[in-house]
Structures are given as structure tokens and as C-alpha cells.
Amino acid sequence: MSRPVGPYSPFVSAGGWVVTSGQVGIVVGENGPELVPGGTTAELTQALANVAAVLEEAGAQMSDVVTATLYLVDMGDYAAANQVWTEAFGDHRPARTAVAVAGLPVGARCEVAVWAWVDGAR
């Protein structure tokens, strides 16, 4: 899991909840965190991998996600984002909100934040 690019925690646990900070499609490169090349599809694939890594550190997994927020700089990428989303979540279908935004940190084209429930009381 890469370190946050700002003054915040990657996740916070409260009761059975794990709440992640927004994750963008960054990897740790030679010069620190950098966006993966390839546009929104590649960035979202990496952002969701980053979400999975944060959840794992918190003792959760993607199948524990109850709700998610997807931020997109270009809503024209919505259909492609849905395909990446389906690949990441498989048959699991958490609630989701998609929001169009004017910009995101580090020039990202997408960002994902999730809430997961981990104590089994669904």
C-alpha cells in the first residue's frame, strides 16, 4: 500500500465499519507516487487494487464493501468504468454513487472511496 499523498489516513475503523479515504490510480515509482499510464481505465483498475490493499490492511476485503463513491473527471468514461468495476467486484454489487468532478488530486481522472462492514452483522 502506498502512503497517502496528503495529511490523512488511508482508512479509519469504527465499530464494524472500515471507511477508506479516496484512492486514485497511483503506484510507487522511482520518484515516489505516480499515476499509472493508460487513462481512466488503467487508473481505475489501479485505484480499485489500491482500495483492496487498504481494505486488506484493515482486515476487510472487496466483498465486505457496502457502499462506494466513484469520482470521474469525464462522465464519458462511465461505461468503461462500469466494466472495470465489474471485473474488480465480480458478482458482489455494493451500492454506488458516481459523481462528476472538475478535477482530482495529482491529476487523476478517477477516485474511489468505500465503506466496508467487517463484523458480519449484515
Residue ranges and their predicted role:
Residues 1-122:
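Short, polar/acidic, helix-capping and beta-turn segments at strand->helix junctions
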